[in-house]
């Protein structure tokens, strides 16, 4: 059933361990990932540049194939990160990077802190000369944190705390009034988190193990997925501070802590949960009128903002809620000896009771199939997940395979309601819109998933990447698919070097394109060859709009 090793997508090149990044190639099968996936510690390495080259301007090379898509303006999407300026150079581009960033896309930061210029403080990366500053540990001060002040003059304790000096001039203790805590009595009774703590904006900066948190722009975090320079950092409350946050939708706030001069790890924070408000009297609740559950207000909207400067950032752990229409198809029985039970394909939620996926993912009995919405970590049962059984599988009638290539590779899954309803809208679960018009070639779109196909393992964390739509005549060229692409298919790939970023996603998962702040499911991950070297092939959703709408109307009375 699922044995298409050479054709269907092997869709993972980068996987995440905890909150650190490791490389993983499904083609090697050298070392399977640890089934427990405990967070690994990360060693920071420094990038050296040759003295006779300008690291701030890097041109693309022949290894970056410019034949991947037709685009008159390679700078249209601004592929340069961290505020870099894109410069057109013939058919390609280069990035002029603001200090201290360098690299072909300004993705690397020069480490001004490697010689430890801060004697009694933390060295932080900044974007203004000299591109670092010292955050001194009180009572030390000065540009290099070498000067010490009287510990209790002036009183550093907040909220009425009383400062007591120790024998050593730099040591002191704050005696805090009731309901206040922290080194400076800065944490008040209202400093708590609700739910999973995604919205927490308090000032706790210690972990459950009483380790101090690193600043989010610490030089030790430059290569971490989550730092002050990440995409939409401000949206997640991340800035130049060391307060606990939860940008990835974990079950409580966390932060990075220092292990040694080059090594960090992450730990959960010592933050209290906000008290639950009093519930109404049960008798009174019974007297309230029964209200129908509201439907989804709109489609294609995410509550996670993007920076104005777009990034091509494939292979990173996706921010929780960034792809709220992403679906995980899971089986209760092993499909093959190499494909155990659990996640095996992706999908897209297009209506509270309907999931769009690839037809080649549906050769399975509905009694062994379940759909999980809002999933971020496959190894955890997260509080915001919603799980449903499948009432019916409806494949497109003309789906077929010729020479191991799927044609008209599309199917609908009708969800079985739970408690009288299907999916409930939340920050983590939303529907994606169906497109009404085609997007032009060169449009930058999104793929997401856990990097799993029918033939291999993948990431436990949801990954995402950006790809560009490729004109079918170009995709049918001899260098690519040599006239095997029909009008039910669409190709998409990146200007990345071969072997990176073009295989993030799952069979059946969505290819979404954005217009005016709304996301549309424009393709369904279908198949591909030479992962990372050739673009992916997707079912073109616009070719099947009439079938989708007719089927949903007939089956559900929409």
UniProtKB/Swiss-Prot annotation:
SUPFAM superfamilies to which the protein is assigned, alphabetical: EGF/Laminin, Kringle-like, Trypsin-like serine proteases
Ranges where the Peptidase S1 domain occurs: 312-553
Domain of life: Eukaryota
Main location class: secreted
Modification comment: Proteolytic cleavage at Gly-23 or Met-27 can give rise to the 50 kDa heavy chain (HC) and cleavage at Arg-311 or Lys-317 can give rise to the 27 kDa light chain (LC). The HC can undergo further proteolytic cleavage giving rise to a 26 kDa fragment. The LC can undergo further proteolytic cleavage at Arg-311 leading to a 17-kDa fragment and at Arg-478 leading to a 8-kDa fragment.
Tissue-level expression: Liver and kidney.
Catalytic activity, EC: 3.4.21.-
Compartments (UniProt record): Secreted
Keywords tagged on the record: Cleavage on pair of basic residues, Disulfide bond, EGF-like domain, Hydrolase, Kringle, Protease, Repeat, Secreted, Serine protease, Signal
Disulfide feature: 75-86, 80-95, 97-106, 113-123, 118-134, 136-145, 152-163, 157-174, 176-185, 192-274, 213-255, 244-269, 299-433, 345-361, 353-422, 445-513, 475-491, 503-531
GO (cellular component) term, any one: extracellular region
Signal sequence bounds: 1-23
Protein's GO biological process: proteolysis
Domain EGF-like: 71-107, 109-146, 148-186
Any GO MF annotation of the entry: peptidase activity
Active site: 360, 409, 507
Boundaries of every Kringle domain copy: 191-274
Site (Cleavage): 478-479
Function of the protein: Cleaves the alpha-chain at multiple sites and the beta-chain between 'Lys-53' and 'Lys-54' but not the gamma-chain of fibrinogen and therefore does not initiate the formation of the fibrin clot and does not cause the fibrinolysis directly. It does not cleave (activate) prothrombin and plasminogen but converts the inactive single chain urinary plasminogen activator (pro-urokinase) to the active two chain form. Activates coagulation factor VII. May function as a tumor suppressor negatively regulating cell proliferation and cell migration.
Subunit structure: Heterodimer; disulfide-linked. Heterodimer of a 50 kDa heavy and a 27 kDa light chain linked by a disulfide bond.
Family under the similarity heading: Belongs to the peptidase S1 family.
Protein's name in the database: Factor VII-activating protease
Classification of source organism: Eukaryota, Metazoa, Chordata, Craniata, Vertebrata
Gene responsible for this protein: Habp2
């Amino acid at each position: 059933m699922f044995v298409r090793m050479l054709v269907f997508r092997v869709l993972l090149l980068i996987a995440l361990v905890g909150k650190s990044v490791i490389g993983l190639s499904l083609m090697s099968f050298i070392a399977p990932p640890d089934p427990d996936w405990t967070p690994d510690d990360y060693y920071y390495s420094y990038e050296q540049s040759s003295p006779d080259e300008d690291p701030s301007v890097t041109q693309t090379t022949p290894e970056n194939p410019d034949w991947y898509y037709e685009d008159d303006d390679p700078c249209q999407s601004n592929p340069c990160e961290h505020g870099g300026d894109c410069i057109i150079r013939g058919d390609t581009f280069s990035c002029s990077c603001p200090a201290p960033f360098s690299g072909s896309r300004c993705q690397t930061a020069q480490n001004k802190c490697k010689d430890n210029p801060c004697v009694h403080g933390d060295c932080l990366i900044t974007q203004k000369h000299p591109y670092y500053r010292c955050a001194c540990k009180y009572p030390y001060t000065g540009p290099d944190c070498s000067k010490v002040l009287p510990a209790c003059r002036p009183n550093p304790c907040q909220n009425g705390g009383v400062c007591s000096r120790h024998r050593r001039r730099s040591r002191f203790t704050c005696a805090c009034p009731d309901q206040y805590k922290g080194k400076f009595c800065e944490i008040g009774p209202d400093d708590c988190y609700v739910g999973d703590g995604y919205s927490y904006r308090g000032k706790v900066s210690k972990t459950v193990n009483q380790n101090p948190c690193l600043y989010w722009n610490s030089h030790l975090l430059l290569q971490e997925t989550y730092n002050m320079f990440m995409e939409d950092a401000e949206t997640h409350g991340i800035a130049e501070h060391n307060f606990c946050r939860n940008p990835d939708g974990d079950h409580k706030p966390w932060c990075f802590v220092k292990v040694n001069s080059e090594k960090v790890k992450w730990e959960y924070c010592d933050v209290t949960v906000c008290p639950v408000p009093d519930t109404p009297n049960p008798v009174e609740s019974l007297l309230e009128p029964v209200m129908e559950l509201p439907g989804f207000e709109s489609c294609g909207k995410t509550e996670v903002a993007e920076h104005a400067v777009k990034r091509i950032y494939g292979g990173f752990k996706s921010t929780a809620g960034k792809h709220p229409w992403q679906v995980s198809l899971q089986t209760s029985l092993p499909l093959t000896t190499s494909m155990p039970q659990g996640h095996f394909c992706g999908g897209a939620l297009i209506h509270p009771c309907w999931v769009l996926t690839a037809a080649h993912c549906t050769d399975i009995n509905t009694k062994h199939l379940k759909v999980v919405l809002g999933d971020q970590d496959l190894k955890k049962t997260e509080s915001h997940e919603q799980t449903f059984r499948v009432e019916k599988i409806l494949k497109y009638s003309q789906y077929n395979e010729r020479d191991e290539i799927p044609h008209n590779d599309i199917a609908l899954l009708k969800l079985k309601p739970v408690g009288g309803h299907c999916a409930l809208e939340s920050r983590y679960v939303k529907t994606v819109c169906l497109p009404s018009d085609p997007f032009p070639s060169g449009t930058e779109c999104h793929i997401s998933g856990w990097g799993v196909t029918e033939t291999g393992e993948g990431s436990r964390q949801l990954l995402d990447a950006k790809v560009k739509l490729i004109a079918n005549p170009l995709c049918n060229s001899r260098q690519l698919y040599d006239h095997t692409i029909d009008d039910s298919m669409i190709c998409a790939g990146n200007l990345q070097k071969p072997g990176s970023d073009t295989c993030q996603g799952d069979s059946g998962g969505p290819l979404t394109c954005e217009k005016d702040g709304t996301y549309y499911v424009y393709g369904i991950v279908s198949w591909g060859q030479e992962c990372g070297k050739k673009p992916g092939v997707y079912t073109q959703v616009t070719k099947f709009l009439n079938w989708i709408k007719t089927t949903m109307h007939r089956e559900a009375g929409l």
